Amino acid sequence: MSYTVEEIANGLGLPFEGAGDIKISGVAEPAEADVDHIALAMKPDFLADLGNSKARVAMVAAGTDWQSFGLQAVLLASRPRFALSGLSAALDQGAEYPTGISQLADIHPEAEIDGDVSIGPFSVVARGARIGSGSVLGPQVYVGCGTVIGPDALIHAGVRIAHNVTIGARFVAQIGAAIGGDGFSFVTPEPSGVEVARQTLGKVGSDHEQVWARIHSLGGVTIGDDVEIGANSSIDRGTVRDT
């Protein structure tokens, strides 16, 4: 995947100077950049490396004397970090999950799969779950009973979403996230040593054996539109109402 300097500039809404027809396939810091990279030199600390860089093109702050570094073209950014957001999006090849529903996926007959959905191998969609249109589920994803996921979700490999979870549109879950697990609440018939220690700020405690009973998590999890959950994050379900 490659773009010309002019195509990138137009896509990002940035001015450029120099040769707009140079093809670009990646980005790198100036010291590591190759001839088909944009050297990221928006900060003054990186400008010194441009003179020895293989890069022909750089992204620099507006007003930089770029020709003195031997460059053939530049993208000019008035707010460099924001410009990097768009540039990285344009050049990100993503996880390249296959399109369509893998024959190795386990889809319950009572699950609802809307149009243009991709589901990777060894993923499971349980009874009554619904996957919104345009969504992508990577390999080894679990979606529990009755869970509803809105359109255009991107759920990366190894994500676990338990039963009765409701998720809005354009949801992103990074690798290994776990949503809707048990709230892990326990209680003892009498005040526990932990409770007593907390109430007395540690002045009184108890180490005698106690019987612990689980408080089951009867609620679910509700997540709105345009939410992203980070890798290996965990969101547990509520006790009597949704988290």
Predicted regions: what they are:
Residues 40, 100-192, 201-243:
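Structural signal for interior beta-strand "rungs" in well-ordered beta-sheet cores
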Residues 1-104, 165, 170, 175-177, ...:
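Terminal amphipathic alpha-helical/low-complexity segments used for targeting or macromolecular assembly
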